[in-house]
């Protein structure tokens, strides 16, 4: 199996880190390499521009890919399917215009000019409005186009809004909300290796924000302990050598651990151990 991932940019390092946490470590190689081996001999990484990854998968150069939802929408390929939201690389694609201008709604741009690196998404967006602007495709520095009288407004990616504020642009409307996704060619929908990769990545996401709690407790206070630690489907209870004592293990949301420890001690729990969870497979 071949999976395409971003070769550089803000998505490159987080993607490789996620693969590593999922047990799919990518072997180091020379710069500018196209392919990289992983710890799984049956799985190879293909490095590509984030914007090109949907086309690589659609054309069969890769079986699956990891890139932003915005890039998937912009490519407009119809033979791939999103498999999993990986919950990083979050951003918004917004319609923005000069703060001191007259554009306060999409309708104000009828007959105007809109600059963007996402012409496909932008045309689809305006097709659902009453405005019909001219869409001008640019390849960078989109936020500058209104100030050089190249465009009346822009459609561009923003994460924090800082770049828009620096360039005295205000958000008129949100066009699209995006994050990084795992997707695959529809022809490999039931492929075991694709499903294995999806399961591995999902296990990392499912473990996020959870802790594994282990403790000893008096057997006659087990119901009280269970009330504090419901766990996933109930806590695991194990017999120990000491009579009248049981060991209890449970997966607990991280936000609940602080209060849970106090409540557990109050019902006689001891030897409480809290550990991180790297992966959680349901």
Curated annotation (Swiss-Prot):
| Listed Gene3D superfamilies | 3.30.70.120, Periplasmic binding protein-like II
The protein's UniProt keywords, in alphabetical order, are: Amino-acid biosynthesis, ATP-binding, Cytoplasm, Glycosyltransferase, Histidine biosynthesis, Magnesium, Metal-binding, Nucleotide-binding, Transferase
Q: Any inhibitors or activators noted?
A: Feedback inhibited by histidine.
Keyword Membrane appears in the UniProt entry:
no
InterPro entries in the record: ATP-PRT_HisG_long (IPR020621), ATP_PRibTrfase_cat (IPR013820), ATP_PRibTrfase_HisG (IPR001348), HisG_C (IPR013115), N-reg_PII-like_a/b (IPR011322), N-reg_PII/ATP_PRibTrfase_C (IPR015867)
Source domain of life is Archaea
Functionally, this protein is described as follows: Catalyzes the condensation of ATP and 5-phosphoribose 1-diphosphate to form N'-(5'-phosphoribosyl)-ATP (PR-ATP). Has a crucial role in the pathway because the rate of histidine biosynthesis seems to be controlled primarily by regulation of HisG enzymatic activity.
Q: What is this protein called?
A: ATP phosphoribosyltransferase
Source organism (scientific name): Halobacterium salinarum (strain ATCC 700922 / JCM 11081 / NRC-1) (Halobacterium halobium)
